[in-house]
Design a protein with these regions (language model features):
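Long, contiguous binding/interaction regions
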Residues: 1-51, 57-110
């Protein structure tokens, strides 16, 4: 799943990091993945739900870049959250910070 996520996020050719970005770069994308294992009657893993938060740290072109990331995530099988928080803009650095939440489901039952 993580390789698929990285491939989806590389659509903009902006460096992608897990958990912590590189503050020296003018733009980067950071993601965090939480795993939830769902089991049913037999108490064995049946479905893994990945809850993913992607944060864009960009200097401009928010709508175009956000739309490209969302489109790429959908094309790679990720389900987007209906609600996207408003962007945060740093007065000091002109960096726009935009979070995108999505989920991915993996069937692990035999």
């Amino acid at each position: 799943m993580e390789e698929k996520l990285k491939k989806a996020l590389n659509i903009l050719n902006i460096p992608v990091f897990n958990l912590r970005g590189d503050e020296s770069l003018p733009e980067n994308i950071v993601y965090k993945v939480s795993e939830v294992v769902n089991s049913y009657i037999d108490n064995e893993e049946d479905l893994i739900e990945y809850r993913i938060t992607v944060v864009l740290f960009i200097r401009g072109g928010l709508k175009r870049k956000k739309d490209a990331i969302k489109r790429s995530l959908k094309e790679h099988g990720f389900l987007l959250s209906y609600k996207t928080p408003p962007p945060l803009i740093s007065d000091r650095t002109d960096i726009i910070q935009q979070a995108i939440e999505c989920r991915y489901y993996e069937n692990v039952s035999n």
